[in-house]
Every structure is written in C-alpha cells, then in structure tokens.
Amino acid sequence: MEKRGLRVGLSVWAVAIVAFLWLPIAIMAVYAFNSSNVQSWPIPGFTTHWFSAAWHDSDVRAALWLSIKAASVATALALVLGSLAAFGLARSRFFGRDAISFLLVLPIALPGIITGMALNSFFAFWTIDLSFWTIVVGHATFCVVVVYNNVLARLRRTSSSLIEASMDLGADGWQTFRFVTWPILSTALVAGGLLAFALSFDEVIVTTFTAGAQTTLPIFILDNLRQGQQLPIVNVVAFVIILLTIIPVWVSQRLTTADDSPAVGRAAAVTAQTE
C-alpha cells in the first residue's frame, strides 16, 4: 500500500513538473493561432492567418534562411572538429589530455554573454568584420562540445578489440571503418549533429555579439517583441522555432537509445568479404 502511494505521489510530482515546464510554451503556441492581434486570454478564436502573414514577411523569410544556413554550417563544422577531437582523446594517451578535454567542454558551461563578448573582442582585435561567418564561428564554439561529448561517450563504451578483431580477420582500414567504426558511431554523430543544429538555430545571446547588422529568427523575436503590431507574427516565429528545436532533439534522443550491438556482427561479416 505504501509503495502504491509512493508511486502515485511521484507520478503527481512528475506531471506537475512537466506542466510547469511546458504550460507556458503551450500557451504561447496557442497564441500563434489567435484570431485577434491583441494578446488576451482566452483567445476569441483560432486562425492560421498569421502564419501566412509571417511567411509573406520578407524580414521573417530572410531571418529564417540565415538561421538555417548558420545552423547547418556550424553543425557541419562541429561534426568534423568534434569527431576528430573525440577520436584523438579517446584513442590516445598523452600529457595534458585531461586538460584539453576540459577546455573543449568549457565553452558550453560559460555564460553565453561571456562567450559573445569574448568573440566580439577577438574579432575587433583582428579587425574582422561581423558577418555570416562570425555567426558560424560563434555557434561552432558550443556546437563542437555537443558532438564531442556524443562521440566520446560512444567510443568509451566501445571496445577497441572490435577494430583489432576486424584487422586480424583481414579487413583493411576502409573496410574496418565502413563495417565496424561507422555503424557504431553513426547514431552518435547524427544525434550530436541534430542537437548541435537545435542549439545553433535558437541561439540568441552569442549571435547578438557576432551577427552585426544581420538578423536571425531569435534576434527577430527580440527586436520585435515590444512592437504590438508585430506580436502575432512574433508568436508564429516563436512557434516555428519551438518545432524546429523539438524535432531534432526528439530524434536525437531516439537515436541515442538505439541498440548498436549489430556492429559486432558486421565485424565478422568483413571476413567473408575479404577472403
């Protein structure tokens, strides 16, 4: 009886916590369909008019395209740098290894305003004009951490004997990578890339210091939030950002819980192809 009461109590607390986290977001999502341009509750009716208005707003489209481009390039850069760093630190032992690992993950722990100010000072010192590429560099500083952590965690859970067994069975470097290493790391890379994209897409603090005169979607929201006539469009833009953030995070979570044990069987399959 006590255990049942404990389970009920924990369930109630879990529901309360989820409601606390998501109720404000749900209310804002409802406002995106508000038929009135005045934000009041309850809303008088539902409409998709503001979605059409947002899509036909050239500033919104330009901000959306810039956010997608910056997030995509920052994610690609993070995948390369994060993966190389994870491989180097997971498979090697050298003096200062732990210090390098600490410095790699530090940017995501620093307040965004500190990172933004540091990057802005760096660009100013080297007389680098703020542009699309300064946004990418700013976002890559924390996107690399996400990819690095995902790949490093997967490598640490993977025995190096799999690669050694593949080599012993006659596989060359490319075959070992294709049939052993890649199946093991693919979900970690995709998950890390999706998380990096989500973080980059909705980043606002670092972007404020690195974008110059350019406007991403989060900056568009920040600039127009206090303008009453733009509030319905701002709600739509915020709703779109929520969707474009939730979807990659959900897919990433599903991928990280996937079972990668079939990679062991793939290592054995290399033998048949090399004989």
Regions found by a protein language model. Give the residues of each.
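A structural signal for multi-pass alpha-helical bundles of membrane permease subunits
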Residues: 23-36, 66, 116-127, 150, ...
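N-terminal, non-cleaved signal-anchor transmembrane helix
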Residues: 1-58, 62-65, 69, 249, ...
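Membrane-interfacial helix termini and adjacent extracytoplasmic/periplasmic loops
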Residues: 39, 43, 48, 97, ...
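C-terminal transmembrane helix and the adjacent membrane-cytosol boundary/short C-terminal tail
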Residues: 3-12, 152-163, 167, 173-182, ...
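Interhelical loop and adjacent transmembrane-helix boundary motif
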Residues: 2-6, 36, 51-59, 201, ...
